[in-house]
Regions:
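Active-site-adjacent structural elements in folded domains
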Residues: 107-110, 160-166, 218
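Glycine- and small hydrophobic-enriched segments that form the cores of compact globular domains
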Residues: 85, 114-119, 131, 135-142, ...
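Functionally critical mobile loop/hinge segments
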Residues: 184-291
Length: 291
């Protein structure tokens, strides 16, 4: 995918009178020299892995550190007992985000979308729609192309690495990708997809990367839920015609600049934020002693 800006993606779709997913697919084919069949096969494979990760979730399994595991099952049980807000879809989004992120912490196979630390966001918003029959696999894969297109632009203009840009570059980027994907899935225009992505990333601007004990567990797993729910809200706003004052490319550029301004302590080093709290330090010391 050779797009270096969201505006370039939108222009390609407009000029050829094709969907945003098709414009991104064509760009990918031109760059990768794959056939359309091969490219789509690869995207379907990624989707199948996302589905498998959810199926493979074990509610009794805990991560090696003991910091994570079992929370997705708690949320699911609470919703079934009528002890949650937001309806079935929001409960499933929360559950799926936790499932995938917990599987990552337990060393299971996930799709880095765009990173392992933010792996729960994109599947969380799509899996419930697939299971409910609201989107078939072909439509889901088109949405994944849209997500990938925005992810590529973020990578090109800023960064996807928490070590470089903080959690805004990981969960923030994943949230933007998911918002655009959801918008496309409901028939949103390319411009609405870009607005959804801009809102989602803008809402998480400045989010730091402060993993306790340097592990992708606390607070990373719960932030996947925030990224997913944020994506849903932003997609809803964009589909309603709500615009964002700052163009998507400028939001991405701002994220890159904010990331460069963050202290190294807040960029995946485990030296600041929650990692530097008394409890965070005690956890790190305990795990070091047990190693």
């Amino acid at each position: 995918m050779s797009f270096l800006s969201c505006e370039e993606m939108l222009a390609a779709a407009r000029s050829q009178n094709i969907s945003l997913a098709e414009a991104i697919l064509r760009s990918d084919l031109a760059e990768s020299r794959l056939t359309e069949e091969a490219s789509r096969h690869a995207m379907h494979h990624l989707w199948h892995v996302m589905e498998a990760t959810s199926r493979d979730y074990d509610p009794v399994q805990r991560s090696r550190s003991g910091l994570s595991g079992g929370d997705a099952a708690k949320v699911e049980q609470a919703h079934q007992a009528g002890k949650s807000y937001g309806g079935d879809y929001l409960a499933e989004v929360t559950t799926e985000a936790l499932k995938t992120a917990e599987c990552n912490a337990c060393m299971k196979r996930i799709v880095a979308a765009p990173t392992a630390g933010s792996c729960g966001v994109l599947p969380a918003v799509l899996l419930p729609l697939s299971r409910a029959g609201e989107a078939d696999e072909e439509a889901i894969c088109d949405a994944l192309y849209v997500a990938a297109g925005f992810g590529q632009v973020i990578a090109a203009r800023a960064t996807l690495a928490g070590a470089e840009g903080g959690c805004q570059a990981e969960v923030g980027a994943a949230s933007a990708m998911a918002a655009a994907a959801l918008c496309h899935l409901k028939g949103g225009t390319p411009e609405q997809c870009a607005a959804a992505a801009a809102m989602a990333l803008g809402n998480l601007l400045g989010l730091v990367c402060d993993p306790v004990a340097g592990l992708v567990e606390v607070p990373c797993i719960k932030r996947n839920v925030v990224g997913a729910v944020n994506a849903v809200s932003c997609a809803n706003m964009a589909l309603a015609g709500v615009d964002y004052a700052i163009p998507c490319d400028e939001v991405i550029d701002a994220m890159g600049r904010v990331g460069s301004l963050l202290s190294p302590d807040l960029r995946e080093t485990g030296q600041g934020g929650l990692a530097a709290t008394p409890t965070g330090v005690r956890i790190a010391e305990r795990l070091a002693e047990e190693a």
